[in-house]
Amino acid sequence: MALKLLTLIALTCAAANAAKSSYKLCVPAAYMKDCEQMLEVPTKSKVALECVPARDRVECLSFVQQRQADFVPVDPEDMYVASKIPNQDFVVFQEYRTDEEPDAPFRYEAVIVVHKDLPINNLDQLKGLRSCHTGVNRNVGYKIPLTMLMKRAVFPKMNDHSISPKENELKALSTFFAKSCIVGKWSPDPKTNSAWKSQYSHLCSMCEHPERCDYPDNYSGYEGALRCLAHNNGEVAFTKVIFTRKFFGLPVGTTPASPSNENPEEFRYLCVDGSKAPITGKACSWAARPWQGLIGHNDVLAKLAPLREKVKQLADSGAADKPEWFTKVLGLSEKIHHVADNIPIKPIDYLNKANYTEVIERGHGAPELVVRLCVTSNVALSKCRAMSVFAFSRDIRPILDCVQENSEDACLKSVQDNGSDLASVDDMRVAAAAKKYNLHPVFHEVYGELKTPNYAVAVVKKGTAYNKIDDLRGKKSCHSSYSTFSGLHAPLFYLINKRAIQSDHCVKNLGEFFSGGSCLPGVDKPENNPSGDDVSKLKKQCGSDSSAWKCLEEDRGDVAFVSSADLSHFDANQYELLCLNRDAGGRDVLSSFATCNVAMAPSRTWVAAKDFLSDVSIAHTPLSLAQMLATRPDLFNIYGEFLKNNNVIFNNAAKGLATTEKLDFEKFKTIHDVISSCGLA
């Protein structure tokens, strides 16, 4: 009796513990409200979930590894990133599939489709054919074919370091195939994209619109590649099984056959061994993309069943209405929301089942091209390494490597001496770096919704009569701090360039020009005024709040010299810009800063040496990474706080990257030279 009682108590306690099971779901901080709304959804399961905020999915993986969270939804590429984290014990324990193919082992399988009578019996004979692809950088139409073809001796080598890895790919494909259709953005830089499409134009010649070679195109995408094959004189198409079956009206999973004008008997799958298989039968796939799913640390296996059931019930609850949390928190979608249990498996083994690791790790032939980014702190080194693995997982090449030096100047010297390829500088340091280390700018940060550089601007109150610089002589001025481009360097350069003041003793002369008094914060600091000149006029208009916008608001000044990034402090109904960059002067609204300003401000800029890698190679990885993450900062927020530090590698305020135009750089050099004559640069 006592034994039965103890057994009953033990079972009751076990049930209670199971009922009280709780799990920590990691979610990008931007989606915390959505996660909390999800927690309010009633389910049969009484398992408790807790939302743990992280910077992004990359940080979520670290949180799971460190037991700060238990699990996180991931893509196959994230599984690869997870496999590279030291001392990790991740397991993939649930898959996200489609209702159409709930039992399919993979999300999709890559196939080659050819005309049945095409005289071909091995993959080498693909050389010289007319090829149809889904689009550049896509899995079944681009990445997987390249992974397969580069193993063949007849495929051109892709290790020419005089051009970028991406151009190596395009050059090889254009040499191997007679004509093709490969639409999309070949480069994140518009000029490079245009140049490549001109040079390798026959990679576009099979498209509906060869001159554009971009989406939308009738011969792009999964079905478009098959249309290209069937109706546009194509000889081989690279696509996936499910769309091949749909194209020919064949049943797919739970979806029955449907009428089609296409005849499957006229086409065949081309297998890796060179044999052909009927379209109506089992496809011979040679690589696949795994399903998305949930990844957790090994400890979740001890109490896996209740967690799996909870996730399934939440997925079922959200399937009809697709609330925000459905996608943003659980990672489900309109098509992919069937949650299936799988045998828990290590991420790398999960990818290997589909031969997908090989696709991710596809190289270009030894020696692999590497771009070395120089950084100056341990935190920046950690971020650089995280960026490197993430970019590699997303097929962004060249490989990013990280070099650490103890100062900005040491990094610039490292680039000059070919110890690294890239280093960043802020503001007018870009011109100084060019002069001292013989470097040149490659790309820079852009800001705001419009993704533009910042500009030095002159703000005045509406109703005033100022239209050009001469109208301000003898007036009062407000400035951003002494060390800033917008507050000091730009207005000084403008006044000197317009011969409104002399370049000798230029700061003192600035005070003479605005003889009504100024507020230039920091002008009286010993390091800024080593000779101890009388700069009282330049401090005369400063109050308890020395910000330029407060100075103008309180009528302590007639004009404020600030950055366009500061315009949010000004009421557009009360203030306007003075267009000093226009010969006729004039005024414009605050939002017109790109065309009404004092000068473009140099952003944080990355510089390179002239004698080593091409600028296109150097810029491709950072620009591609920025382009990919522009709409998906939840994957990796490269502009956000990193390990509780701000402005690591990129400024927090940045919204993207852009190549630096030579003309803009020449202007910065001119400004630098003029300001140097004042002894300021």
UniProtKB/Swiss-Prot annotation:
CDD domains: PBP2_transferrin. Residues 23-364, 371-676 form the Transferrin-like domain. Fe(3+) binds at D75, Y108, Y222. One of its GO terms (biological process) is iron ion transport. The keyword Transport applies. Glycans are attached at N218, N355, N418. Pfam families: Transferrin (PF00405). GO terms for molecular function: metal ion binding. SMART domains: TR_FER. Disulfide bonds join C26-C60, C35-C51, C132-C228, C181-C207, C204-C213, C271-C284, C374-C411, C384-C402, C478-C551, C506-C678, C579-C596. SUPFAM superfamilies: Periplasmic binding protein-like II (SSF53850). Keywords: Disulfide bond, Glycoprotein, Ion transport, Iron, Iron transport, Metal-binding, Repeat, Secreted, Signal, Transport. Residues 1-18 form the signal peptide. Hydrogencarbonate binds at T134, R138, V140, G141. It is found in: Secreted. Belongs to the transferrin family. Transferrins are iron binding transport proteins which bind Fe(3+) ion in association with the binding of an anion, usually bicarbonate. This transferrin binds only one Fe(3+) ion per protein molecule. This is Transferrin. It comes from Manduca sexta.
